[in-house]
Regions:
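Conserved small/polar residues in nucleotide/adenosyl-binding loops
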Residues: 149-154
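C-terminal alpha-helical interaction appendages
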Residues: 1-28, 34-88, 92-98
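A charged, amphipathic interaction segment
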Residues: 83-143
Length: 154
């Protein structure tokens, strides 16, 4: 498989997406689903999916959230950078890996597995090896694809 960007950038991408979701929820007060819709509608979602290194490595997760929401400079809230990793951080972290691995856009992934279902995987998957969570996401994607296919055929 050809990946959108080299694996050397993957950890940075995971951290960035995790920080973005955590900042949007805990510092800006957005509901995860509401913010994630804004991300999907922004140009940054597609640019991230395609491996745009400026989006992936050129800014922090908080900066990415600020750009997605187009927050004026005077209204920017400094990120709290909590050392404890939240469910939202883990959601972004695992989502970035899953997106990198399968090459789907975030929009395609969201149609198969809504962001709230990924967040709900936090317990017990954040304690497990990443491969367990990725395997579960693949299974969820296949079930969703089968359901979409059978509903279209009916």
């Amino acid at each position: 498989m050809i990946y959108a960007y080299d694996k050397v950038y993957l950890r940075i991408a995971q951290r960035s997406l995790g920080e973005m979701l955590s900042y949007a929820v805990y510092d800006l007060g957005y509901e995860l689903e509401d913010y994630y819709k804004r991300f999907l509608q922004s140009e940054y979602s597609m640019r991230f999916s395609k491996g745009d290194l400026f989006v992936i490595t050129g800014m922090s997760g908080a900066e990415l959230a600020i750009r997605v929401l187009d927050i004026p400079d005077d209204d920017i809230i400094m990120p709290s950078y909590n050392t404890a990793k939240s469910q939202e951080y883990w959601t972004g972290w695992i989502l970035a890996y899953y997106q990198w691995e399968n090459g789907k856009t975030f929009e395609m992934i969201d149609k198969e597995i809504p962001i709230c279902k990924i967040r709900n995987m936090y317990n017990p998957y954040h304690e497990m090896d990443i491969s367990s969570a990725i395997l579960k996401l693949r299974e969820m994607s296949q079930v969703s694809s089968c359901l979409l296919y059978t509903s279209d055929a009916a």
